[in-house]
């Protein structure tokens, strides 16, 4: 995983998420106890994704393909970073993207941003746990000639397997192509967390 890309996503989270929280606090009207309870209830919603996976996929535009999917928990709870890589038969990379997922207790939802194209930080989405499934709605290709919206469902989730399915809209949600994209993932590595990029010590910042 490229360190500069990871640092960029972490800086984005540190700058953008507190500002969003400040804007939403009054409207949400939740006490600190309620916010803590929501956070504790949902901070592990994506724990099933942690670790390393091999996947097979079928897409109505690109056909059948496969690749690797890895996710790590960040130093702060309720934040997950994953990398999704599509590979060819000889191991060559055809597509690579990273997604930062962070739980927002003020809005009681997960918020996502995917980076994998020259269009910057525009592929935004939101997600919620629904029973035993995770549901996400996310935009892709924003700023390009063919933006689309995906309604994504993670289901049949187990310790070593999960299924992923998406409907797609190219007209802002007016019409949908059902089952446009399907993924089956099998675990090949255990869950893990990323080590903190910074470390506290007894010296105050700027004292060295």
Predicted features, each with a name:
Residues 7-17:
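Bacterial N-terminal signal peptides
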């Amino acid at each position: 995983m490229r360190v500069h890309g990871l640092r960029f996503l972490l800086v984005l989270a540190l700058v953008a998420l507190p500002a969003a929280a400040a804007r939403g606090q009054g409207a949400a009207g939740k006490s600190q106890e309620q916010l803590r309870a929501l956070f504790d209830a949902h901070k592990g919603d994506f724990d099933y994704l942690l670790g390393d996976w091999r996947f097979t996929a079928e897409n109505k535009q690109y056909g059948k393909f496969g690749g690797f999917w890895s996710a790590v928990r960040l130093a702060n709870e309720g934040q997950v970073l994953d990398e999704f890589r599509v590979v060819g038969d000889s191991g060559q990379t055809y597509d690579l993207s990273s997604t930062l997922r962070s739980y927002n207790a003020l809005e009681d939802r997960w918020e996502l941003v995917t980076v994998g194209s020259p269009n910057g930080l525009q592929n935004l989405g939101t997600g919620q746990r629904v029973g035993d499934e995770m549901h996400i709605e996310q935009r892709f290709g924003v700023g390009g000639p063919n933006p689309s919206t995906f309604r994504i469902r993670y289901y049949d989730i187990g310790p070593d397997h999960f299924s992923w399915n998406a409907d797609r809209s190219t007209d802002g949600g007016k019409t949908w192509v059902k089952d446009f994209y399907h993924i089956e993932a099998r675990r090949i590595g255990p869950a893990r967390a990323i080590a903190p990029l910074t470390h506290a010590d007894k010296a105050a910042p700027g004292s060295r």
